[in-house]
């Protein structure tokens, strides 16, 4: 189907930006970086970043300018899943067919990996190659959507 082509391309773009943006597992602190990569790479449907690309394509936006917000949204999603899988939340053992971060590593590393993914998402947006006004709008939007008025608030209601 012709509509699948852009979705596959966009998913590959996000995977490539994640691969480039995340520190290698060999970079200190190795365990933390390995956990971050475990949480984000090689799995998932990438629905949220695909929505970013799809919305941008409606306005004719060059895909290169959408890489940062699409990848930041995926990092926030990964961070939320890492924290949601913790024993204090849902205590899930598997995510995307592999052990969750707290099972594959440990709880402390999972918490730090989630926190680091959240910080990395904001850093990626802050350094995006767009004008300052747009960067601030993206940062404000991501903070609102992931904070107490959004995802964190919803999780608080869930627990």
Roles of regions detected by a PLM:
Residues 6, 22-159:
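Mg2+-dependent prenyl diphosphate-binding active-site environment of isoprenoid biosynthetic enzymes
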Residues 1-23:
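N-terminal amphipathic/basic leader segments beginning at the initiator methionine
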């Amino acid at each position: 189907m012709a509509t699948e082509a852009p979705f596959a391309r966009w998913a590959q773009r996000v995977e490539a930006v994640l691969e480039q943006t995340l520190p290698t597992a060999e970079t200190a602190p190795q365990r933390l970086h390995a956990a971050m990569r475990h949480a984000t790479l090689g799995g998932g449907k990438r629905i949220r970043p695909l929505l970013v690309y799809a919305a941008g394509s409606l306005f004719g936006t060059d895909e290169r300018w959408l890489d940062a917000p699409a990848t930041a949204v995926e990092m926030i999603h990964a961070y939320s899943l890492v924290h949601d899988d913790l024993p204090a939340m849902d205590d899930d053992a598997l995510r995307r067919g592999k052990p969750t971060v707290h099972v594959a590593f440990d709880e402390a590393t999972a918490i730090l990996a989630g926190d680091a993914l959240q910080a990395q998402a904001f850093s990626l947006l802050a350094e995006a190659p767009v004008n300052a006004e747009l960067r601030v709008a993206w940062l404000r939007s991501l903070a609102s959507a992931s904070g107490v008025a959004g995802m964190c608030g919803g999780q608080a209601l869930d627990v």
